Amino acid sequence: MRQPLLKLAAVTRRFPAGDKDVVVLNNVNLSIGAGEIVAIVGASGSGKSTLMNILGCLDHPSEGTYTVGGRDTHMLDSDELAQLRREHFGFVFQRYHLLPHVDAVANLEMPAIYAGTPRADRHARARELLARLGLADRAHHRPGQLSGGQQQRVSIARALMNGGQVILADEPTGALDTKSGQDVIRILHELNALGHTIVIVTHDKAVARHARRIIEISDGEIVADRPNRHYAEAFAEVGVGAAATTETAADTRSAPASGDAPPPANNDTAADPAPAPDASPPAPAVSPKHAGWRGSRSCRTGCARCLTMLGIIIGITSVVSIVAVGEGAKRYMLEEIGSIGTNTISLYPGSDWGDSRADTIQTLVPADVAALAEQPYVDSATPETSRTLLLRYRNVDVHALVSGVGDSYFQTRGMRFALGVPFDDDAVRRQAQVAVIDQNTRRKLFGATRNPVGEAILVDNVPCVVIGVTADKKSAFGSVKSLNVWVPYTTASGRLFGQRYLDSITVRVRDGQPSAAAEKSLEKLMIQRHGRKDFFTYNMDSVVKTVEKTGQSLTLLLSLIAVISLVVGGIGVMNIMLVSVTERTREIGIRMAVGARQSDILQQFLVEAVLVCLLGGTIGIALSFGLGALFSVFVAQWKMVFSAGAIVTAFVCSTLTGVIFGFMPARNASRLDPIDALARD
């Protein structure tokens, strides 16, 4: 004689109650063969529900052994027990335990999702089962739109979704009227006739009459185990015939789960054991789409989630916007610095700024400018010497800074012209009495609208013709109020200042040449020419680097503030997910009962948290672009600059926020005991 399908040997189940343990099952020995229809009868508190939970691998014995098809369940881990529930057991609960937020088809598909069944296959099977149970026209109704009998039939169909070799029915008619109860009993008979093993747990002896075998339990002990002499009579009462069986429940055992060989319908013959849990390949992980989408639809705290998402939105908007503002400010500052001549190196007499001997050093001469201009790393070089002198035009007298410069000065400094042209090399050689003035000088001498080009002005009583006016410069460092006039340095030396030496030399380094290396080379050249180092250099590249470092530091500081808001949003995600786990405890129990593994539950809640954060991140990035558009309207000088790196970083941050702050709630959900979870309201 072959071994029974389900076998309990000396099973005891205790539960802690304060300092003592309460014995719910005591030394239970029970064997159930494949294809049997068995009723476990007992009063409330007799231990029958605990026995059913152990039979369905929802609970485990404190002592003794429970084998399914010869396999000791004590030796199985949580995933293997989930595989047993998923592929070989189907549960029919008194309270139906259907997910209220999805329709009948989606409720049926749930076990098949965890079994890894393709979407088209599970959808077709769900509709087929509903049709065979008379619910074809209720396929897209939610549980709240179905009667009690219809909900119980959906529960039965769900139990059959993956084959349902063993159907465990806990008070299947307890919440139904007489007619609906008879319909459920008839369906169970039909399933048994097709080879399903049926275990009915009930306190109602009228329901127990429909089993071939009645097992009575009292105070955790089996007090009777006898065949039912009235089975044929009860069988006839519900009107189960061959035609009805074929019409209503044919092929209900054809399940997607592999290794599920149907046992013979003859329950007097011992059945083949159920396939071992490792006989079938492990079900693939639930797709993130189903894990997150189904879960997000089930959340009853939509408003709370929106508020939680608001924290993520604010955090991501802050991070992206601050980075964009910082990048825009940095570029604007560099452009402003560029307007005064970037990539330039200036040489001054003396050892450093404030050198008291600098006025006595007269070694910087025009020949040095010519030597520097010939170097391969130099784009241009210009001398400079300056004094504050009196300017006069007609009856207007003003003091201005008069600078004697070379013809390449304006190129070296990156200056642009509003009117006229700069002087050329010929003017420098001829000591031409020409001048270039800035906008401030123009306004003082000629007014804001008059064109001064071609007019003669007196520079310290030396007449000079204005040939150009530089463009006005609006600097990030403030508007320039000084008056400036530029004349050829030969004119300044010979006609105005009476000196042959230079105050400074400015060198523009060629593009692509390292500024630091160029600085060292020109220092070496000048030391060779002068025989000693009687000058010092000022590299504008150091200013650029300082501005860049300052901008980066400021951006980092502001980003840290934004990250704090992102962390606050992440804590909000964790809080709402913890609340969600508490509110959806029964749903978690249902999912575990139909075969969800701990990793499936963990993934579901983790994906939900990530989806919330990703959605918040997407909205935050969109808001950042909107703020950028508004910013450009109200701040015309510079714009927020969005980079792909900042956007990618924002998405990564939102994803990591979901993973980090969603992990603990997801782990708590995955570690719930299915029995405790199902017992929650």
Curated annotation (Swiss-Prot):
Amino acid composition bias (Low complexity), ranges on this chain: 246-273
Subcellular location field: Cell inner membrane
Enzyme's top EC category? translocase
Where along the chain is ATP bound?
G42, A43, S44, G45, S46, G47, K48, S49
The segments labelled Disordered in the record are 246-298
Q: Name one Pfam family in it.
A: FtsX
Q: InterPro entries per the record?
A: AAA+_ATPase (IPR003593), ABC3_permease_C (IPR003838), ABC_transporter-like_ATP-bd (IPR003439), ABC_transporter-like_CS (IPR017871), MacB-like_ATP-bd (IPR017911), MacB_PCD (IPR025857), Macrolide_Exporter_MacB (IPR050250), P-loop_NTPase (IPR027417)
TM segment ranges: 306-326, 554-574, 611-631, 644-664
CC annotations in GO? plasma membrane
Q: Name one GO biological process term.
A: response to antibiotic
How does this protein sit in the membrane?
A: Multi-pass membrane protein
Q: Which CDD domains does UniProt cross-reference here?
A: ABC_MJ0796_LolCDE_FtsE
Q: Which GO terms describe its molecular function?
A: ATP binding; ATP hydrolysis activity; transmembrane transporter activity
> Gene3D superfamilies attached here?
P-loop containing nucleotide triphosphate hydrolases
The UniProt keywords, alphabetically, are: Antibiotic resistance, ATP-binding, Cell inner membrane, Cell membrane, Membrane, Nucleotide-binding, Translocase, Transmembrane, Transmembrane helix, Transport
Where in the sequence does UniProt note compositional bias of the Pro residues kind? 274-285
**E.C. numbers:** 7.6.2.-
Q: Where is the ABC transporter domain?
A: 6-244
**Function according to Swiss-Prot or TrEMBL:** Non-canonical ABC transporter that contains transmembrane domains (TMD), which form a pore in the inner membrane, and an ATP-binding domain (NBD), which is responsible for energy generation. Confers resistance against macrolides.
What protein family does this chain belong to?
A: Belongs to the ABC transporter superfamily. Macrolide exporter (TC 3.A.1.122) family.
Quaternary context? Homodimer.
Name under which the protein is recorded? Macrolide export ATP-binding/permease protein MacB
